[in-house]
A protein has these predicted regions:
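Short, basic/polar, glycine-containing "phosphate-handling" surface segments that engage DNA
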Residues: 1-21, 71-74, 78, 84-90, ...
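Nuclease catalytic cores
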Residues: 22, 26-40
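Short secondary-structure transition/capping motifs
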Residues: 27, 31, 69-70, 101
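Residue-level detector of alpha-helical secondary structure
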Residues: 37-44, 114
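Active-site metal-binding core of divalent-cation-utilizing nuclease and nuclease-like domains
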Residues: 42, 52-86
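A general structural signal for alpha-helical elements within enzymatic catalytic domains
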Residues: 43-48, 213, 217
Length: 250
């Protein structure tokens, strides 16, 4: 897919969406239809093999639908995981139906940021085709955050034409393989106040160590200082082991 043809294809999607916008905004028009009618063709125009038409083995698929991410002991499923050959994740895309207000609703933004944060991805996307929001996932999400928190780019479908260079240069498969995605991540998402999930985990250990020590003292008044320290360290070691196991999907 050339850049010129991709722009034509996306322009046709925009025109069709605009012509029937009222119908698409109705609640009956669901997420599955949105994905099939608009989101899949949108990313296909950007060069991604959305349905594995190349017949690649599972480990080499470019796009995984309903990928698996462990969050707090539970397994969640982002709608799309875009990957390099060999399975390295680049970014998630979470699809919504057009009746969802992507710009202002808190839950969708928290959801995608939580997925990206847990998977250690730099950015991820929410889109219902009508709206397209890119989020920095290196900043730990909080349920009290606004929908605009950590959002580094926001477009509506009417912006796709004038912003096509951005879409192509950042998210097309061709440009991703040439490093443009990495340049965008480096320039726009590594901001002051961001941290990684590993750094956050390590920072939490000191706080947990104190809480664990206090609890052990309360529950075991007969233990001396060395015994308490041993019990605390043993508990911390188990937490670290569980974290490593989670990262390795064990």
């Amino acid at each position: 897919m050339t850049k010129e043809q991709a722009q034509i294809n996306i322009s046709e999607l925009v025109e069709r969406f605009n012509e029937q916008l009222v119908s698409y905004k109705k609640s009956e028009y669901n997420e599955t239809l949105t994905r099939r009618d608009f989101i899949d063709p949108f990313f296909k125009a950007l060069g991604w093999d959305m349905d594995n038409s190349n017949g690649y083995a599972e480990a080499y698929r470019e796009v995984i639908h309903e990928d698996k991410v462990k969050i707090g002991g539970a397994t969640k499923a982002p709608d799309y995981s875009f990957r390099l050959s060999g399975g390295k994740r680049l970014f998630f895309v979470e699809a919504k139906k057009p009746s969802v207000f992507v710009k202002d609703e808190i839950l969708p933004s928290y959801q995608i940021r939580r997925y990206g944060w847990s998977a250690k991805l730099p950015i991820s996307i929410i889109t219902d085709f009508e709206e397209f929001a890119v989020y920095d996932c290196t900043k730990k999400p909080n349920t009290a955050d606004k929908a605009s928190t950590a959002r580094v780019k926001y477009l509506t479908f009417k912006d796709y034409s004038k912003e096509f260079d951005f879409l192509w240069d950042t998210f097309s498969k061709e440009k991703v393989l040439k490093g443009s995605f990495d340049k965008f991540v480096a320039s726009d998402t590594h901001k002051k106040g961001t941290t990684t999930v590993d750094k956050e985990f390590l920072q939490s250990l000191d706080h947990w160590r104190t809480l664990i020590a206090i609890d052990i003292c309360k529950q075991n008044k007969n233990l001396d200082e060395d015994e308490i320290n041993f019990a605390v360290q043993q508990t911390i070691d188990r937490l670290i082991f569980l974290r490593i196991a989670e990262d390795r999907s064990i």
